[in-house]
Amino acid sequence: NIDYTFKLTYAVNEAVSIYGGISTGFKASAWNISRNSDPNASEVAGLIAAGTPASPNRSVGRRYAGPEEAEVIEIGAKIYLPSGYLNIALFDQTIEGFQSNTFIGTGFALANAGAQSADGYEFDLVYSPLENIDLMMSGTFLDPVYDSFTGSSFGDISGTTPSNIPEETITTSVTWNWNMNGWDGYTRLSHLYS
């Protein structure tokens, strides 16, 4: 598999740069090693042909999922502020053969979705109002969807939102950097909303 990344950046001035790009990626096959790792139909036939008795309490399942292929298109800006910075980005991601590991009550079922996509935006802001105080806020806002997933453990779930992918994630923190008796340290208070 050959993947690529192509990006362009333009410096508007000393404080602002804008960029855009496209990237592809690959994730190798995955194996289900949970207690629900049942052999598929061809594996059961092979076991029986080899003289291995088929267990009556086992069912035909999915032991592995094929590889994923991803493509991401992104545009954004990096802005330096007098006492910090702001990064913002818009993106559109598509994954063909998305590896879904779905909880089914007693274990997990591994399967490939036809396609899963997510578009959205993210930001990262750091501001230091005083020399020893840093304020940080970052966020990601997604619209994830199974574009095509006809072979899930629950039937055709195309058009639904994948589980365990939050649509909104916001992180904030306040950091106090201090020096006391020759010791450097910091105290941080942070919060995650998802």
Roles of regions detected by a PLM:
Residues F26, N32-G46:
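A surface-exposed, glycine/aromatic-enriched loop/edge motif typical of exported proteins
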Residues Y4, E14, S29, Y64-P67, ...:
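Proline-centered helix-kink/hinge sites
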Residues N1, W31-S37, F98-T106, L142, ...:
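Outer-membrane beta-barrel translocator domains and adjoining extracellular loop/strand segments
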